[in-house]
């Protein structure tokens, strides 16, 4: 996503320059260097490495899976996840399952959320260990217990999940 967004920004700058706007090259470089999209492959902790990604549809999971393959090649990844029931979660997890060592499911705080137990039952089809947790805090504790200090965990599936994960990480 970030590369596509940068390409759109650069194209916009080119169009504005063609229309007479003066946009300093150093400002463009600084803007690109400082650009960040919280909740998109965002590293929030080390030992173990914890990555947040708010991807909540199949296209976002394609991007997340590509980032995992690029930046964590061959590494087993613990996946803490929760999803809204009205999302196409079958196609979402088809992208992620080949890269997951294990899944930990939680229920996001949203009336449309899929129950962690239902999601766990669905994810078992991929043949990976799956643990359903009653609370997000319990899921974060389980994720930290299941991920070695030199390992990586990815928290994904819903933007509604990420804030609660960050709060739970601060408390454990």
Positions of PLM-derived features:
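Short, active-site-adjacent cap segments at secondary-structure transitions
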Residues: 161-163
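C-terminal helical cap/extension that packs against the catalytic core
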Residues: 49-51, 58, 93-152
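Glycine-rich, phosphate-binding/catalytic loops in enzymes
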Residues: 67-68, 122, 171-172
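Active-site-proximal loop/hinge segments that shape catalytic or ion-binding/gating pockets
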Residues: 158
């Amino acid at each position: 996503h970030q590369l596509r967004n940068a390409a759109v920004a650069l194209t916009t700058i080119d169009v504005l320059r063609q229309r007479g706007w003066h946009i300093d090259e150093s400002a463009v470089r600084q803007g690109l260097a400082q650009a960040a999209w919280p909740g998109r492959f965002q590293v929030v902790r080390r030992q173990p490495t914890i990555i947040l990604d708010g991807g909540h549809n199949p296209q976002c999971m394609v991007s997340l899976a590509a980032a995992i393959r690029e930046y964590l090649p061959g590494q087993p990844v613990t996946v803490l996840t929760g999803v809204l029931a009205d999302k196409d979660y079958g196609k979402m997890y088809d992208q992620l399952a080949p890269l997951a060592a294990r899944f930990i499911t939680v229920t996001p705080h949203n009336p449309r959320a899929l129950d962690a137990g239902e999601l766990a039952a669905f994810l078992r089809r991929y043949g990976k260990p799956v643990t359903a947790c009653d609370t997000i805090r319990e899921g974060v504790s389980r994720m930290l217990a299941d991920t070695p200090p030199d390992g990586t965990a990815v928290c994904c599936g819903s933007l509604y999940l990420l804030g609660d994960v960050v709060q739970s990480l601060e408390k454990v």
